[in-house]
Structures are given as C-alpha cells and as structure tokens.
UniProtKB/Swiss-Prot annotation:
NCBIfam families: lexA. Represses a number of genes involved in the response to DNA damage (SOS response), including recA and lexA. In the presence of single-stranded DNA, RecA interacts with LexA causing an autocatalytic cleavage which disrupts the DNA-binding part of LexA, leading to derepression of the SOS regulon and eventually DNA repair. This is LexA repressor. The keyword Transcription applies. One of its GO terms (biological process) is DNA replication. Residues 31-51 bind DNA. The active site is at 128 (for autocatalytic cleavage activity), 165 (for autocatalytic cleavage activity). It comes from Clostridium acetobutylicum (strain ATCC 824 / DSM 792 / JCM 1419 / IAM 19013 / LMG 5710 / NBRC 13948 / NRRL B-527 / VKM B-1787 / 2291 / W).
C-alpha cells in the first residue's frame, strides 16, 4: 500500500506541474523538465507515470509532436498549439527548413503569432539588437520572406552568415542597422533577405 501511495503522489505532482506550466506559459513542460521538478532522474520513469495518467483519462499525448500533452478535463489546455522549427544554421542556396538544419521545435499557443505560414526560429547570439529589446539567447520567431521594407527587422545572409538587423535600402546600397548605439551599421551592395521578425520568445 505504501508503494501505491507514493505512486499516486508522484502522479499528482506531475499532473499539477503540467497544469501550472500550461496556465503560466501556455504550453506543457518537456519530460526532462518534469524529471527536474519531481526529482526523478529517469525519463522512462516519467513516461511511465504519463502513460498511467493517460490510461486514467486525465491527459492525452501525441507521440509525433514534442511537448504534446493535453489535460483532457482542464479547459486551459484546449488552446490550439503550433510547432515551430528551431533552425541551427542558415546557408545560402540551401532550403532553410531542410531536415538537417532543424535542431529542435518550440511549441507555443497559436494565438501568440499572427501569421502561421513558413515560420522558423533562430537563436540570437550577441548584443547587436538590445535597444530593440532583443537579447543574447532569445529565440527570434521569423516569418520566411524575401521582401522587406525600410525599418523592418530582418534576417539577412551576408557571405553565408545570417544576421538579424534593421533593414534600410539607400540608393545603391543596403544598410543593415544594429539596435545598439555602440555598433556600426553594415553597409553592403546587396544581401539576401530570408525572413522578417514576427516575435521574440524568451526562456526565464
């Protein structure tokens, strides 16, 4: 009986943690986050608890999607979600969303983004856009497009390197302006715009 009591307590902790994460963040935790929260080192043990919660009709899982845990009897979990690929590298002449370029996926509520077409995510490295509220380590949600207007924050390819800057077309040059007064703009004859900033996701 003692073992049954411990099992029920752990399952309750897991269920409440999932519920709180959905309430606070809009999406469920990963299995590793559940491990850390309830003090379990084995992901297979957590999967076992999730399977039992599923059999009890408390949750529903989709094995084809990351973080796809739905709390069946809880209305806060009924939001539609979207999986956005996190791209590790961007290279000229190569499809951005090629399988080999995708490092992971981020699952967020659908209402967090205005346009769900051709979205991908790049992790921000550096401080060139801090005055626009974009910080090192942020996840930039990018709408794939080759078109940009002056003042748009874009992802541009320059000599096979991707950079996020504010775009300005000036006569026969293009100015890629950082949002950091200590840094100089990048002036180029041409560049390939591959997307525009659609939003920022920050993990705390």
């Amino acid at each position: 009986m003692a073992t049954d009591k411990i099992t029920r307590d752990v399952q309750s902790e897991i269920y409440e943690f999932i519920r709180q994460e959905v309430l606070d963040k809009g999406y469920p935790p990963s299995v590793r986050e559940i491990c850390a929260k309830v003090g379990l080192s084995s992901t297979s043990t957590v999967h076992g608890h999730l399977s039992r919660l599923e059999k009890k009709g408390l949750i529903r899982r989709d094995p084809t999607k990351p973080r796809a845990i739905e709390l069946i009897k809880d209305p806060i979990s009924k939001r539609e979600m979207i999986d956005i690929p996190i791209v590790g590298k961007v290279q000229a002449g190569q499809p951005i969303l090629a399988v080999e370029n995708i490092d992971d996926y981020l699952t967020i509520p659908l209402n967090f983004v205005r346009n769900t077409n051709d979205l991908f995510i790049l992790k921000i490295s550096g401080n060139s856009m801090i005055e626009a509220g974009i910080y090192d380590g942020d996840l930039a949600i990018i709408e794939k497009t080759n078109y940009a207007q002056n003042g748009d924050i874009v992802v541009a390819l320059i000599e096979n390197d991707a950079t996020i800057k504010r775009f300005f077309k000036e006569k026969d040059k293009i100015r890629l302006q950082p949002e950091n007064h200590t840094m100089d703009p990048i002036i180029v004859d041409n560049c390939e715009v591959i997307g525009k900033l659609a939003g920022i996701y920050r993990r705390y």
